[in-house]
Structures are given as C-alpha cells and as structure tokens.
Amino acid sequence: MASDGVVTVYGDGAITDTKVSSYAVKVGLAQMLRGGVIMDVVNAEQARIAEEAGATAVMALERVPADIRAQGGVARMSDPGLIKEIKSAVTIPVMAKARIGHFVEAQILEAIGIDYIDESEVLTPADDXHHINKHNFRIPFVCGCRNLGEALRRIAEGAAMIRTKGEAGTGNVIEAVRHVRSVLGDIRKLQSLDDDEVFAFAKQIAAPYELVRQTKQLGRLPVVNFAAGGVATPADAALMMQLGCDGVFVGSGVFKSGDPARRARAIVQAVTHYNDPHILAEVSCSLGEAMVGINLKDEKVERYAERSE
C-alpha cells in the first residue's frame, strides 16, 4: 500500500486505514460504470430516454453545455429540486456538477443523495486557485484533465474517476482526443523511465511521487478514465474507446441532435462494440442530423478546459 492515501486499485492486499478504505470504496463505485455511457439530461423525460437507451448513469443539469456556451453568464450548480426530480425518474445512478472549488455546492449535492459529483470546468469556477478536497465527502467525485499531471493532482485531492476535459458543448472531439493522447502518451513515457528518473518526472508534471510511481507500475491511471467533451456521434464514442478510455460522457451530442432516442441507443452500442466496424456502421445509419458543431480554431470560442490546472 502506497502512502498519502494512494490505493492500488487493480492490485491485491488488505486496506486498514479508514480514510484510505473510504477512498477505495469510492474508486470501486466509479469502476462499476466502466464500459458505459453517461448522458447529460435536463429533465425527467430525457433521463428516462437515456436509461432506456442503456446509459449507465445520467448527469442532471439545468442547461447542457451547448446552451451554457450560447447563453453565457455564470453557470452554477443546478436547482436541487430538478436534480431530485431526475433522480426519482430513473433507477440508474445520477451525477450532478459542482463548480470548481465550491465545496458548499458539493455539500448540498451530497445532502440530497446524489450518486456522484462532477467538479466541472463547464460551470463557472468559484475558486481559481483551489479545487474541492474530495476526501471530505462520502460520495465519489469525477474531475477533468488535459494531461497526466492534472489527472494525478485531481486523484491526490480525492477524485475517484477522471475524464478528459475536451471542449464540452462544441460537438467537436478534437480536444478530447488531444487530452487522452496526452495522458496515455505520458504514461508510456513514464514506463520507459528507471526509478531514479521517476522522481524528476513527478516534479516535471507537478504530481505526487507515490501516484506517479503507482501509475508506472499499473501502466494506466489508478482510477477509471472516461472520455468527455465534444463526443457527438457513435464513431466519436468508438474512437475514444479505441484510444484507451474506459467509457464515455455524452453531453449536448444526444439531445441537441435530430433523433435523441435513436442516437442515444447508437452511442451506447458503439461503446459496447467499439472494435467492430460492421456494428458501428449499422448503428450509425439514419440517426437524423447531428448537433451543430463549433470550430475550435475560432479565437472567440471560450476554452473551458483552460479554466483550471
């Protein structure tokens, strides 16, 4: 067992420390979502559509990221009443977003019985210097990252699940691809280093040494790593799975499309059968119009992924 609350998720051995044991439980809960699709929903009807399509969880929101981009202003935690309404409509786990650093929003979400909390850069950050201490909560947190250093810093704070940041609400998968390639590329580089070089690498990426060492041993992140931010089609979802992700978040891509129920089912099938081009071709047919995407080369587009490190 590594020190500083590090849990060898994919290894064996008894866990005796209470705090570490609690974290291990949260990591285990996050692993239960592995291989699945998590969909953004704004009402009970959409939540039921997502569940019927085979989603492993839903993210309860007042506005999907595409609407947050279009409408601007300050994006905050959703109304707890809406979240409870969505939670009562489905049997699958329900997630909700809290602003970065806003531990009181997280306390409220925990109090209403939410299953997972996403400390999300999609919402307007409440603290530009500190993230939530996620070890203070009983329920699992998911956090975004652009690279291995960010991922391991969030895990050190208590995140039980990592996702790419991508660029939510754009329907453009390029940043999600960039982020997952960065994380996996750094892990491959890490595995080629000798033990002495690992210290310098940990310092270089500003991550705790014990987590860096554990990642080298595992050959992967010590928690599940999902794709998020710009996934809009079954092909996008399968691409992220083939690149090495453990599952996929789909935000605006489903309910901003021409046939949400059909597209939701297709994306779930694409994640399940991501290595079978014949099934991918079949589920990609006749889905209706995809959401209108945003060109990220436009300098006017706000980069949510840059809101925290």
Curated annotation (Swiss-Prot):
SUPFAM superfamilies: Ribulose-phoshate binding barrel. D-glyceraldehyde 3-phosphate binds at R181. The keyword Ligase does not apply. It catalyses: aldehydo-D-ribose 5-phosphate + D-glyceraldehyde 3-phosphate + L-glutamine = pyridoxal 5'-phosphate + L-glutamate + phosphate + 3 H2O + H(+). GO terms for biological process: amino acid metabolic process; pyridoxal phosphate biosynthetic process; pyridoxine biosynthetic process. InterPro entries: Aldolase_TIM, PdxS/SNZ, PdxS/SNZ_N, RibuloseP-bd_barrel. Its EC number is 4.3.3.6. GO terms for molecular function: pyridoxal 5'-phosphate synthase (glutamine hydrolysing) activity. Pathway: Cofactor biosynthesis; pyridoxal 5'-phosphate biosynthesis. Catalyzes the formation of pyridoxal 5'-phosphate from ribose 5-phosphate (RBP), glyceraldehyde 3-phosphate (G3P) and ammonia. The ammonia is provided by PDX2. Can also use ribulose 5-phosphate and dihydroxyacetone phosphate as substrates, resulting from enzyme-catalyzed isomerization of RBP and G3P, respectively. Also plays an indirect role in resistance to singlet oxygen-generating photosensitizers. Vitamin B6 is an essential quencher of singlet oxygen in plants, that can protect cellular membranes from lipid peroxidation. NCBIfam families: PRK04180.1, pyridoxal 5'-phosphate synthase lyase subunit PdxS. This is Probable pyridoxal 5'-phosphate synthase subunit PDX1. It comes from Ginkgo biloba.
